[in-house]
């Protein structure tokens, strides 16, 4: 499909209060369809809420195709908030140790909600078990297996779970026998070095040449580890309901693992700028933000109000918002995207003036919603609705 033009968006936005964030529903629906096709088979897709951060969009994705089932949350309070909003089947992607949060989640479990807590050490098990005993419930848990691979001189992956070996995983699995108020119902392994690392990112320079090789070797490594731990859990007769894997960038490899039951996807729905740099897939730029030209300091240079919405992670040029439309925008080396104003050099063919809009895409997906109270939903050339983000609902979970 052909993406909308600059004038398509400019006419929609130029008379509104700017900056604003938007989601193009036509492109979002296309992404939902394409992601479902990539994952088609015998697995479901769990939505990573941190990459969406808007309940209206979460509902749209869940309703778009039966393959979308359940949400991976990023904090306990977010999970409880989503329960209040009518969502269920929630998997926390990260451990929590706040006793009040755990107590409230155990209480929700007792009331019939499906919330699975993440653990990666015996201290987590004991903490949740003690609180679940107070509540009078058996709380389901998920073990986070580290999927990183160590090569000579290179740690290829992230620093998350201490369950880095099959032996460590078996040891933690055996610990469940000591506790009566927790149950092992899920395993998760997020292969960040495959799912979240593009092969064509200009900021990575010469590293791009070796990344595909490292990915291939890493997939072989962690696939074997994941299978061994799944087999071990089954040998212990635990009621394993979920084996969660993947991310937007590793759907194809994760779906090849027969023991995996579901794949988590998040960033692919909005398809932010960092997801332009993958070799094997391309999704549509469904979300972004619009700023307004308010100055022209000299010929060929314009300045917008706002724009400095920088992504998390290691500091780098690829964490800046990426100019989207019109084509021909070059950020200045001295200022980049600014706290209050963003200057840029322009060499494009579109005629632009004071009051016109300039479109950017955030480097990451859900973080866009931390800077705006609402998303303007666009469909077929019209703004059809304005929906609150988490921030617009008065929520700030991290």
Regions found by a protein language model. Give the residues of each.
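Generic N-terminal amphipathic, Lys/Arg-enriched alpha-helix
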Residues: 4-23
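C-terminal accessory subdomain/extension
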Residues: 296-398
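Conserved, mostly hydrophobic/aromatic
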Residues: 28, 50, 82, 143, ...
